[in-house]
Amino acid sequence: MAEISRIQYEMEYTEGISQRMRVPEKLKVAPPNADLEQEFQDGVPNASVIMQVPERIVVTGNNEDISFSRPADLDLIQSTPFKPLALKTPPRVLTLSERPLDFLDLERPLPTPQSEESRAVGRLKRERSMSENAVRQNGQLVRNDSIVTPSPPQARVCPPHMLPEDGANLSSARGILSLIQSSTRRAYQQILDVLDENRRPVLRGGSAAATSNPHHDNVRYGISNLDAAIEGASDDMTVVDAASLRRQIIKLNRRLQLLEEENKERAKREMVMYSITVAFWLLNSWLWFRR
């Protein structure tokens, strides 16, 4: 009802202005003075200026003058329709209570080009080392058929020593993997030292020639193959560690949100309890003073 009355009032107000409003014929700057006005009219005839409202206002001559032609941009602006813009009020409070961290997903992450490339590189390294190992073993078999070499003594390998910093890194998968790599490299170096000491020259055709030990080569190629396999496994472990870290971050975030909500509820309960306690003591004090 109020809206209808307001609209009716606005219509009547607009209609009244349109009917009663008049343009004045003269505009006076100073307050009226009879003597001054009489002198001014006697000295200067037709001193007053009649005010007229033009029917239209033309911009730059309306192409009548070449030097002051109508700009084409004005016609383009007037002919181009403008679409109304709709604005939406942003929310006052932004919370994560509905679905926290939508950009983190508990599902298995999609394989990225970097992870796929690292896996492909590890796979190529393993295949290359296996093929080289097979080719060299075949060459060693042919060489053993043509060359007679004495059987080397049994190499005695010392167990790899563990450094004190290796024991501190056993709490994570990366530490265990680094421990395996370091122990493998130390064992490989010890085997090479022992085999270099036991290598002897072999006589062939009256000349002394130092030939490579097939057992030594087999051990070298086997350990290189193991190193390549461990490198490929480290790439896979990196991808698995990233996925597990993401899951742990999501769990920690949710747990933190639950703790924050519990703290807020506990603060509200404490405020209510404090208010009740203070009111109780004030009431008791007032009753005691009245007695």
From Swiss-Prot:
It is a single-pass type IV membrane protein. Residues 240-271 form a coiled coil. One of its GO terms (cellular component) is synaptic vesicle. It is found in: Mitochondrion outer membrane; Peroxisome; Cytoplasmic vesicle, Secretory vesicle, Synaptic vesicle. Plays a role in mitochondrial and peroxisomal fission. Promotes the recruitment and association of the fission mediator dynamin-related protein 1 (DNM1L) to the mitochondrial surface. May be involved in regulation of synaptic vesicle membrane dynamics by recruitment of DNM1L to clathrin-containing vesicles. Keywords: Coiled coil, Cytoplasmic vesicle, Membrane, Mitochondrion, Mitochondrion outer membrane, Peroxisome, Phosphoprotein, Synapse, Transmembrane, Transmembrane helix. Belongs to the Tango11 family. One of its GO terms (molecular function) is protein homodimerization activity. This is Mitochondrial fission factor. Homodimer. Interacts with DNM1L. Interacts with C11orf65/MFI; the interaction inhibits MFF interaction with DNM1L. It holds the Pfam family Miff. It comes from the Eukaryota. Its main location: mitochondrion. The gene is Mff. The modification Phosphoserine is found at residues 129, 131, 146, 151, 178, 182, 244. Residues 106-134 are annotated as: Disordered. The chain crosses the membrane at residues 272-289. Residues 1-271 are cytoplasmic. It comes from Mus musculus. The modification Phosphothreonine is found at residues 89, 149. GO terms for biological process: mitochondrial fission; mitochondrion organization; peroxisome fission; protein targeting to mitochondrion. The keyword Acyltransferase does not apply.
